[in-house]
Amino acid sequence: ASFAEAPPGDKDVGGKIFKTKCAZCHTVZLGAGHKQGPNLNGLFGRQSGTTAGYSYSAANKNKAVLWABBTLYDYLLNPKKYIPGTKMVFPGLKKPQDRADLIAYLKHATA
């Protein structure tokens, strides 16, 4: 199912998902720096593999996806299927509600 068919996201629930599943490798605050994964500030509208100061896989750079609600929704289902060769080891979020909640949080936290 596509993002257009996704349930409404809850940013507060999404924040909890971020803390438990994403924060080990990612930061969202402006200038927070990179961890194992890149800082996600300014994520929406940015092309994959272009965050300054982070060493991306060739796969991530070459995919050249523009991050938006719909592309993140598909990516977060199964990152390694969406971008074969990505360094991201996270297996994905299978539940549409979890992905919608996380995206709602990211839209708020990375703006």
Curated annotation (Swiss-Prot):
PTM N-acetylalanine: at which residues? 1
PTM text: Binds 1 heme c group covalently per subunit.
Q: Where does heme c bind?
A: 22, 25-26, 88
**Does the keyword Methyltransferase feature in the UniProt annotation?**
no
Q: What does this protein do?
A: Electron carrier protein. The oxidized form of the cytochrome c heme group can accept an electron from the heme group of the cytochrome c1 subunit of cytochrome reductase. Cytochrome c then transfers this electron to the cytochrome oxidase complex, the final protein carrier in the mitochondrial electron-transport chain.
Alphabetized PROSITE patterns for the sequence:
CYTC
- N6,N6,N6-trimethyllysine: which positions carry it? 80, 94
Entry's Gene Ontology cellular component terms: mitochondrial intermembrane space
Give the family from UniProt: Belongs to the cytochrome c family.
The alphabetized UniProt keywords are: Acetylation, Electron transport, Heme, Iron, Metal-binding, Methylation, Mitochondrion, Respiratory chain, Transport
**Tell me, what is one Gene Ontology molecular-function annotation carried by this entry?**
metal ion binding
One Pfam annotation reads Cytochrom_C
Specify the species: Pastinaca sativa (Wild parsnip)
Q: What is this protein called?
A: Cytochrome c
Enumerate the subcellular locations listed in this protein's record, separating them with semicolons.
Mitochondrion intermembrane space
